[in-house]
Structure formats: structure tokens, C-alpha cells
A protein has these predicted regions:
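Charge-biased low-complexity segments
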Residues: 1-116
Length: 116
């Protein structure tokens, strides 16, 4: 999970508010990865067609902490749709801040779809 820029205070995932400031980024990454694993469903049609690959998802954590502007790039529309569904289900966050003010923070994350 990569923020596209550097901010004084990165967004904070719910339940990461109580960790030390130096650990909030690690907590954020762990919680996002856990969210992806928990909500991941391989699209049936993609399984049947043997489609796999990596979908790159770009999104913004807005000034109010909501997830907006979800954009995907991947090998198949069904995989892209599932990646958007997973990211769209992320909870509202504590927004990132610059000079004490909430700011929009762009993120990029790859989601890998691999058949077993």
C-alpha cells in the first residue's frame, strides 16, 4: 500500500488510532491487507476462464476519511470489478493531515488474483 505523496500525518485505519504514531503506517498496511484477505472473492467467470493476474487499484482517502475515486488497471474487467468492490468496502479512516488540516491522500495498491 503506497501513498502517492508524503504527508505530515498519514490517514489512520480504524482501530489503529491507539498505536504509537511511529507504528500507524505499519498498522494501516496490516489492516488493509487483512481487509483484502477477508473480503476477497475470486470471480467465478474468471476462474472458469483461467484468468489471473495483478490489478493495480488507485484510490483517494478524502478529507472526510471516505474512499473515493477508485480506479483499476488489470488483465480482465471481472478482476478489476472485484478489486474495486474490495477497496470500496474499506471503512472510513481518520484523514491524512498537512499543517494540521485534513487533506486528500492518493493511494495505490496491487491486488493479485492467482488460481491455485
Amino acid at each position: 500500500v503506497l501513498p502517492s505523496a508524503v504527508f505530515e500525518d498519514s490517514p489512520i485505519f480504524p482501530c489503529c488510532e491507539r498505536v504509537f504514531k511511529s507504528k500507524t503506517r505499519v498498522c494501516f498496511q496490516e489492516k488493509i491487507n487483512m481487509h483484502i484477505r477477508k473480503n476477497f472473492r475470486y470471480p467465478e467467470i474468471a476462474q472458469e476462464m483461467g484468468i489471473q493476474g495483478r490489478v493495480y487499484v488507485n484510490f483517494i482517502i478524502s478529507k472526510d476519511g471516505s474512499i473515493t475515486n477508485i480506479r483499476m488497471r488489470g488483465p480482465d474487467k471481472n478482476l478489476e470489478k472485484e478489486a474495486a468492490r474490495i477497496i470500496g468496502r474499506l471503512p472510513n479512516m481518520t484523514p491524512g493531515k498537512q499543517r494540521g488540516r485534513p487533506v486528500r491522500v492518493p493511494f495505490s495498491i496491487p491486488i493479485t488474483f492467482r488460481l491455485q
